[in-house]
Amino acid sequence: MNYLTDKKLTIVGAAGMIGSNMAQTALMMKLTPNICLYDPYAPALEGVAEEMLQCGFEGANITFTSNIKDALTGADYVVSSGGAARKAGMTREDLLKGNAEIAAQFGKDLRNYCPNVKHVVVVFNPADITGLITLLYSGLKPSQVSTLAALDSTRLQNELVKYFKIPASEIKNCRTYGGHGEQMAVFASTTTIKGSALSSLIGSEQLPEAEWKEIKQKVIQGGKHIIDLRGRSSFQSPAYLS
């Protein structure tokens, strides 16, 4: 099986739903065979590792540890979903205090154990803020740390698919701006619908202004909607898009 690279990828928070799905997604996408799973909760972590091994991914070298030093040492790429998840009735910002402390420690661990890491992705909410905190404490360059950014854009695409009843392939360049939270901005300026600018359709019979406002609100509340439906925060979509 040909992988994109053979460099070490460490997944922090691997015993959680996002982390475990990221591990499987990385192997299914053939990103790298060398995956290290880290989580402080050892029993669940071992369970995830066993499941990954039982998948029988060809050429995979899956290791797991509850020692953060061992997990990060030698890592070229790190993805962390190691924060608390949002629950019903919470905003992403409600997670800030606890997850900010986790992000600060994560940044320090990166500085201490893998200062030569190539790239780090921070997934836990509020992702824009926890990513910035990680960056500040890690000493890495801004280009080396990113956060989950594509999910809000795909949520916009999905809402437009449902509204116009056309395939996703006919909706291009969906973009959202600002933080991954309640104050995000949803713009129409770059999006095209079957080759036509979305901005030219807003206010017409095809997309009345009131309908566009409703679509934007659905995008902003996309995560809350998943919690309302499933009783837990999103994990499959952020795991895939990270």
Regions found by a protein language model. Name each.
Residues 19-20:
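N-terminal Rossmann-fold NAD(P) dinucleotide-binding loop
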Residues 15:
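Conserved glycine-rich cofactor-binding loop
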Residues 91-159:
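Rossmann-like NAD(P)(H) cofactor-binding subdomain of soluble oxidoreductases
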Residues 28-34, 139-142:
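Conserved S-adenosyl-L-methionine
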Residues 138-143, 152-242:
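C-terminal substrate-binding/catalytic lobe of Rossmann-fold NAD(P)-dependent dehydrogenases
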Residues 6, 31-75, 84, 90:
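Conserved N-terminal Rossmann-fold NAD(P) cofactor-binding segment
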